[in-house]
């Protein structure tokens, strides 16, 4: 079933002399209905197969404030065999989770007795106690219990938080998607979700990142950098370890409160350049003709086969790109490292390659060291330093969510990556099916279409644009543009409700 409606059956068996002990194998079935966050209705029947007896139980509970305040009023009643309703045994009571994992309860019984009790959770362990009283208020039987196993909500980490740095050791290429099997790479969404989780965790006071073996384009690094900047603005620390870093890598690392660099590493602030190889002379020498069909001034994709040098239009647009990239990197680096803009340009134009000693002297980094010595280095920089490895942090089970009738809608994240093609790259034939399926799925509240495409086949681009146009208004479509959304890659975006791009796109 679901959080709204569920059915269940069970079979119980006993051993020994069942007749002597008046015991029986049992068969039971039950149903639970929670149509909204305010009401819960349950019913259960148990049959004693050896005696032809049965018990019927019904219960109802109301949360007057929904899931926001876990106060519940409840009542139940049971009948044996064919008893009339006026013979039913019943009870009614209240349960209140005062704070997370601390629950108080009281119940009144049709026998005119009542009980009070409390339940205290320590996470994987819990203790509970209930005391019965008769109609005169005289105490009767009491019951105590200990719970072991499943993780429950608890207030104790909040009362005595153990602040730790989260260690993120990100190796290899950062991708959008990874293979189902035998792929240990990391995706962009995984990294962003990890940073977001750590940002709201009161037990995490910082992140320390191994950036020595990461491969990603400048746009992906910019997005992760923005998440780390938000993490910092929440009052938490960021430490990044580097060994060799170019201008993109240093731009990323500069967001950190502390940059730790390998003693034998280097930083190269080489700036940016875009260039092309031109093949017209080679083709002429080989007596091969090439005709460029150029419809617009800036459509320069194949001009390197038809010209001997860059056209003025292509030079103009490429210069705009590198100027923007450099301005963004310079602005972010100088703000983060509290550096004068002219001093940064001097570092780029005069030397550009810096050893660890020189980088420390120029305050490009804060200290030197290697990731293998991470804990020792961090202990020197932060008093009472403690850490938790990403594997243990993200593999931790979460407490059971006891929300009623809670089936959150989902956001579909769909990727259009590579050249615009019918059967390769964005794979338009299949992508159309994915988009239409998400449009028709009632559980999907919105669609995020991530585009990273230089363009290509106009037919493939129009396939995707058309399905978005036909479904316009059905549900929100947000296009997120990655490193490139050019030509047909931009065409894909046109009918979205919102288009989001980074300054580097």
List each language-model region with its residue ranges.
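Outer-membrane beta-barrel porins/channels
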Residues: 1-154
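Small-residue-centered hinge/linker elements
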Residues: 140-340, 345, 353, 379-476, ...
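Short acidic loop-to-helix transition motifs that present clustered carboxylates
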Residues: 16, 111-113, 245-247, 373, ...
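A ligand-binding cleft/hinge motif common to bilobed small-molecule-binding domains
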Residues: 372-379
